[in-house]
UniProtKB/Swiss-Prot annotation:
Name of this chain's protein: Photosystem II protein D1 1
Chain sites annotated for binding chlorophyll a PD1: H198
Chain residues that bind chlorophyll a ChlzD1: H118
Alphabetized PROSITE patterns for the sequence: REACTION_CENTER (PS00244)
Residue numbers marked as site, Stabilizes free radical intermediate: H190
Misc. remarks from the entry: 2 of the reaction center chlorophylls (ChlD1 and ChlD2) are entirely coordinated by water.
Record-level Gene Ontology MF annotations: chlorophyll binding; electron transporter, transferring electrons within the cyclic electron transport pathway of photosynthesis activity; iron ion binding; oxidoreductase activity, acting on diphenols and related substances as donors, oxygen as acceptor; oxygen evolving activity
Reactions catalysed, as given in the entry: 2 a plastoquinone + 4 hnu + 2 H2O = 2 a plastoquinol + O2
GO biological process, one term: photosynthetic electron transport in photosystem II
UniProt-annotated location(s): Cellular thylakoid membrane
Membrane topology: Multi-pass membrane protein
Gene3D superfamilies per the UniProt record, alphabetical: Photosystem II protein D1-like
Binding residues for Fe cation: H215, H272
């Protein structure tokens, strides 16, 4: 009899836990994805904070030249970072128990792997949690689809790119200056600015910002007048009121006259789909671009594409960009290479540009 009661109590406890996890009445929805998301993001956050403050220098290039990244080792908020794991580790999984000691684990940049793996799993579960809450509330699933764009970007720079390059030391550092270094080296090695997928991403982000500003300002300006002509239209409203405050027909008329008729949406759902889809598709393409360049399918190369009748090169902006790329490449990881492959495998490049002689 006692055993039976214990089983019922256990089953009842599990059922209550399930109901609590899936309840939409909680202040913050947990969900089954949240059961994984909460501990993984907590682990990533705690490790990041500790490493950013106190981690010792990391031998990122695997040549016994540690790079300092934490605040206690001389950095500030701008220069500080969690330094990626060592090139000596490569793509090997490097948890704490694989190192001979905690000092070795820290020296080889073990915290970086701990942070990015927990972060990527937690961020993925956050997307799943968005779908789960939408499902519980009877909503359509497009919120998590939009979130997949920044998630794909995170996977591209923290996982796909290191896999393609053969080492987690090539992943993006977790800090401000480290991110800038990652961007500069990426341009030097892959010419990302000349990659069409990155260009689509730029159009998506800047265009999305423009459309967001246009939409917000237009809606804010298209008030339904609740006051007399002698009073300010602002007096007819209070912040946070439930009633609709703007007239989409008036907004459509204004914008149609400002640009032209068919540049303006007269359907609210079509408008908001466009506002969501434009930046999302752009960022998707950027993530795809990073993922292809991870395997060295790089941006366009128009070097030496214009020559005169005698075969002499007439430099274009593509050649100027190439010269900048070479300069950035020879400066990074200075002691890790005897000579950059791009320079060692070709004829010597002049230090300064030479203006072509004009025989008139």
């Amino acid at each position: 009899m006692t055993t039976t009661l214990q089983r019922r109590e256990s089953a009842n406890l599990w059922e209550r836990f399930c109901n609590w996890v899936t309840s939409t009445d909680n202040r913050l929805y947990v969900g089954w994805f949240g059961v994984i998301m909460i501990p993984t993001l907590l682990a990533a956050t705690i490790c990041f904070v500790i490493a950013f403050i106190a981690a010792p220098p990391v031998d990122i290039d695997g040549i016994r030249e540690p790079v300092s990244g934490s605040l206690l080792y001389g950095n500030n908020i701008i220069t500080g970072a969690v330094v990626p794991s060592s090139n000596a580790i490569g793509l090997h999984f490097y948890p704490i128990w694989e190192a001979a000691s905690l000092d070795e684990w820290l020296y080889n940049g073990g915290p970086y792997q701990l942070i990015i793996f927990h972060f990527l799993l937690g961020a993925s579960c956050y997307m799943g949690r968005q779908w789960e809450l939408s499902y519980r509330l009877g909503m359509r699933p497009w919120i998590c689809v939009a979130y997949s764009a920044p998630l794909a970007s995170a996977f591209a720079v923290f996982l796909i790119y290191p896999i393609g390059q053969g080492s987690f030391s090539d992943g993006m550092p977790l800090g401000i200056s480290g991110t800038f270094n990652f961007m500069i080296v990426f341009q030097a090695e892959h010419n990302i600015l000349m990659h069409p997928f990155h260009q689509l991403g730029v159009a998506g982000v800047f265009g999305g910002a423009l459309f967001c500003a246009m939409h917000g300002s237009l809606v804010t300006s298209s008030l339904i007048r609740e006051t007399t002509e002698t009073e300010s239209a602002n007096y007819g409203y209070k912040f946070g009121q439930e009633e609709e405050t703007y007239n989409i027909v008036a907004a459509h008329g204004y914008f149609g006259r400002l640009i032209f008729q068919y540049a303006s949406f007269n359907n609210s759902r079509s408008l908001h789909f466009f506002l969501a889809a434009w930046p999302v598709v752009g960022v998707w393409f950027t993530a795809l671009g990073i993922s292809t360049m991870a395997f060295n399918l790089n941006g366009f190369n128009f070097n030496h594409s214009v020559i005169d009748a005698k075969g002499n090169v007439i430099n274009t902006w593509a050649d100027i960009i190439n010269r900048a790329n070479l300069g950035m490449e020879v400066m990074h990881e200075r002691n890790a290479h005897n000579f950059p492959l791009d320079l060692a495998s070709a004829e010597s490049a002049p230090v300064a540009m030479i203006a072509p002689s004009i025989n008139g």
